[in-house]
Each structure stands twice: as structure tokens, then as C-alpha cells.
Amino acid sequence: MAGSPRVYNSQHCGFSVAVMRFLLLLLTAVLISLAWLSPDHSYPWLTFASEMLSFAAFLSLLALFLNRPLELPRVQLLALPVVFIPMIQWGFGLVVDFSSALLSSAYLLGFWLTMLLGYNLSRSSADRERMFTLSSYLLFAVALLTSLIACIQWLNLESHVPGVMNLYSHRPYANFAQPNNMSTFLILGLLGCLYLAEKQKLKQYYIWPVAALIVFAITLSQSRTAWVFGLFFIIYWTYKSWRYPTHLKRYAVLLWAIGFFAVGLLFPRFTRLIQKLKEGNVVQTSSVVERASAGHERLGIWQQMLDAIHQKPWTGYGWNQTSIAELSSMSSNTIHVWFTSAHNVVLDLLVWNGWLLGGLITICILIWICWLNVHAKTTESIIACLMVSAVWIHTLLEYPLQYAYFLLPVGFLMGLIQAQTPDQTARSVPVSVIRSIWVIGIMLLALIWRDYNLYKVNSLRILKNQPANIEIWGSSKILVLTEFDQRLYWLKLSPVAPLTSTELDQIEKMVQNKATPYNLQKYAQLLLANHQFEKAQQQIAYLNRLHKKDYTLQDLQQANASAVESSK
């Protein structure tokens, strides 16, 4: 009898741990779901709400290890130095802004840590199946909601449904505000359906109608990235299902893939039919041929970025500073568009870091992905590889990994795949380190929320010619997001203010990194007011070419005269 209290306490403790684990996993699922479904896309940080929710989900998942150590595979240590590259570049003056470098390093660290979390939560085959099943259920549910939202937009009914974004183009995008991002996410949901069907976790009559709706919503997006992945899927699944037999018949799965292409070809006719039956307007869509023959701007972007790399082959232009590379290589610009990404992750890495470092990072990523794929032999790891491939294929054409709601889940999935690779030596990360990271993460997230909202309030006051003196938490000073602090100064600055050459050079770096029409025009006005006519003419040329404007030096002189008059 003397041992009974200890047995009871042990059982009670185990029950409490299980409940806490369940609650944290549930909270993580809710937060990342809200990140995917958030309709809040407001200027200047369009995905601010989704990014905050994604990192909150990450911290919720990290809380599972506040009382137990994380196992760190030694191979993972090779990737850790990459986390600090943006901050090192800022220290040497290559990255213009501190907060840009800090956030870049924070995103890289988040990606690295979610890989560790995926690895540690999937060490055994039972844990791996459990985690991937939960992930597939989550993707299944959110993809269903996203598909319904896309259909609502396609039918022009979004104004009648709360929580749904208004559609401003002919390609539905649900609440992602970007059709290709929606398409890639729906592919993840479709692969979740495949896993649930393969492992018989749900009845077929639940899965296939939802899968059909998801395929239809992907077609609505008219994403060419989805077509590329469809071809990749056919090849990959044919090979893997031949090597490792599956429950589902190979021909049945491949018929679904072929059906996706058939729906795309027939979709314009289907749209016209629905329009007749509905006796109203539905969103007009392009045909497959029209979509395939459009959007060749990427070729011009890639060519210009190669020229930019040749200009700075060793150091690059700094992490997340593709815009500076574009303005530095305007002599080879063939497209009239301002871009902040090379629309290809390999080119972005080379632009940011130069041939040597960027090439080394690219080669390591390629080797790592191939290594994971070679060891993908179970249903969980094979379908996880397909999910990761969907996002990585997207990165070759756009920039999905700049969004935390893709970056962090991809890290988690890659950690899950890595957990089933054999003979990995690992060391333990002390609990104290995990707790420190968690506390710093909470504090950083809170400060970012504060700084961003402080900027939004005070920037509106500046535009209304009111003093920017609103305080949050007892201060009106921006602490972490220094880029927004510079923007407040920039908004307050008169376009005819007398400045030194050093001050103008500092502003030039900021403008090159954010070459919006407002920034280019105002900087040109400043140069003109400070008698730097050639540079002013150059900024006008950038403005006209990148944003399809038609300004002249005389227009700026008139604008400056008006600014002088209004300041009297």
C-alpha cells in the first residue's frame, strides 16, 4: 500500500503530460489553419497576420519540448551557419536595414528548428504515422474550406459571405490573395487526401468528393506550377509505387492526375455552361493555351538577374535585396516591371550571396533533398516528399518560401522524412536552450506586433499632417522593425528638404530596396531640389520604365514648386 501514492502520482503526471501535448498540438493546428485562411491582407505588410499566426503555431509546437531535450542530428549542424548569413551581411554593410537582416535570420532559424521538431516528433514509425495522419487530416479540412472559398469567388458571391476576400482578378485565390499560392496549398491538401485513402483512414465516399472539389479549385487558379507538378507526380508516383507497392491501384491514382489535365482543357466550356445556367456573371477564365503562351516576363527577369550576378559575383547584393540587384542592372532590363524576387530560388540565392556562397548553399540543398528522397520508402515519407516537392517546384518559378505558412510546414515535413533515414548520430539540445529560444521568440513576436501596429497608426497621422506621437506600451519609438522607423522619417521628410550627399546616399539604398512609384518620385524630387540633376533624371527613367509612368524633369520641377508653396 505504501507504493500506491507513487503509482497514482506517476499515472496522474503521465495523464497531465498527454493532455498538455494534445492541447499544444490542437493549438498549433488552429493557429496554422488560421494562417492559411486569414483574409487580412492590408498594406504595407500584406501577409502580416498570416506570418504572425504561423510563427505563433511554431512556438506552440516548440513548447512541447520545454521540459525535454531536442535530439539534434549532426548533419543538421551543417545548415546552422546559414541562419546567421543575413546578420553577418548587415554587419558588413551589405544588407541595408537591421530589421530586414533580423527577420531573414529569424525565418531561417524557424525553418531549421521546425525541421528538428518534425524529426523529434517522428522518431519511431508509430510516431511518424501518427504525426503525418494528423497533418493530412488538417490539410484535408483546410483545403476543403479553401476550395469552397475559391468557388464562392468564382461565382462572384464573395460579397455575401463574411470572411472571404473580394476577388480583384480573373483567377480565384481564396484567402491567399495569390492564385499560385492557393494552388500549391491545395496540392498539399490533395496529397493529404491521397494519404488518407492509401492508409484507409477515411471512407472513400468522404475522400473522393473532396478530392474532386480540390482538383476543381486548383483548375480555377489556372496555375501553371500545378501543371508542372502534375507531370512530376505522374513520373514520381509511377516509380515509387512500383518499387514499394501501395494499397491504391496505380492506374486509379494516375487517372486522377490525367483527369486534372482534362478538367483544365475543358474548363472554359464548363464556365460558359455555368454562366448560362446561373443567368449571371461568373469569373471568366483563360484557356490552357492562353495561359501557357502568357507570362514570359520570367525569362526577362532571369536574364537580368544573371547579368546582375556577373556584376557582383563574389559578395552578391545581400539577403532579400533582389530589388537592389534589379536597379543595379537596369542596362539589361527588358521588362517593364519592378520585382523583389528573381522568381527562382536558385537565382535568388546567387543574387543574395554571390556565386561561391550561393552556389554552395544550392548544392547542399540539392544533395539533402536527393538524400531524403533516396531513403523515402514508406507511405508517409513518399507522400511527404511529394508535398515538399510541390513547394520546391513552386520555388523554381516564384517565391512561396518567403511566406512562413509555407516555409515552416515544409521544414516540419523535411524533418519528418529525415527521421526515417538510418544511422543518424545525434546530440541533445539542452532544455535551457529550448526555453531561451522560446522566450526570445515570444518577446520578438510581441515586439514585432507592437512596432507594426505603431507604424500603421503613426503613418496615417503623418499623411493627415498630424504629429506621429501615438504610443504603444508607453513609447512611440519603433524598437525592432527599423525599416518602418525609416519609413516614418521618409514620410515626414519634405521632397524639397536640403540634404547632404551622405544623407542622399543613405536614402538611395532604401529607395533601391523598395523601388515603389512613391519612393522613386520623391527621391527624384529630393535630388532635383539638391541640384543633382543627372541622378534625378536617372530616377525618373527608373520610375517610367518599372511602373509604366510618363514623368519628365519639368513635372518634378512643378511638383517641387508646389511643395515649396505649400510649406510657406
From Swiss-Prot:
Q: What is its EC number?
A: 2.4.-.-
Keyword Membrane in the entry? The reply is yes
What are the record keywords, sorted? Cell membrane, Glycosyltransferase, Membrane, Transferase, Transmembrane, Transmembrane helix
Q: Where are the transmembrane segments?
A: 17-37, 46-66, 78-98, 101-121, 132-152, 176-196, 214-234, 251-271, 349-369, 376-396, 397-417, 429-449
Pfam families according to UniProt: PglL_A, Wzy_C, Wzy_C_2
Q: What happens when the gene is disrupted?
A: Cells lacking this gene lose the ability to glycosylate substrate proteins and their glycoproteome is highly affected.
Q: Determine if Membrane is one of this entry's keywords.
A: yes
Q: A Gene Ontology MF term for this entry?
A: glycosyltransferase activity
User: Can you say where in the cell this protein is located?
Assistant: Cell membrane
Look up the record and give one Gene Ontology term from the biological process aspect: protein glycosylation
Q: Which InterPro entries match?
A: O-antigen_ligase-rel_domated, PglL_A, WaaL-like, Wzy_C_2
Give the main localization category.
membrane
Membrane topology classification: Multi-pass membrane protein
What is one GO cellular-component annotation here?
plasma membrane
Q: Which PANTHER family match?
A: LIPOPOLYSACCHARIDE BIOSYNTHESIS PROTEIN PA4999-RELATED (PTHR37422:SF13), TEICHURONIC ACID BIOSYNTHESIS PROTEIN TUAE (PTHR37422)
Family according to the record = Belongs to the PglL O-oligosaccharyltransferase family.
Function comment: Catalyzes the O-glycosylation of multiple protein targets. Is responsible for general protein glycosylation within A.baylyi ADP1. Does not act as an O-antigen ligase.
Name the UniProt record assigns to this protein? General O-oligosaccharyltransferase
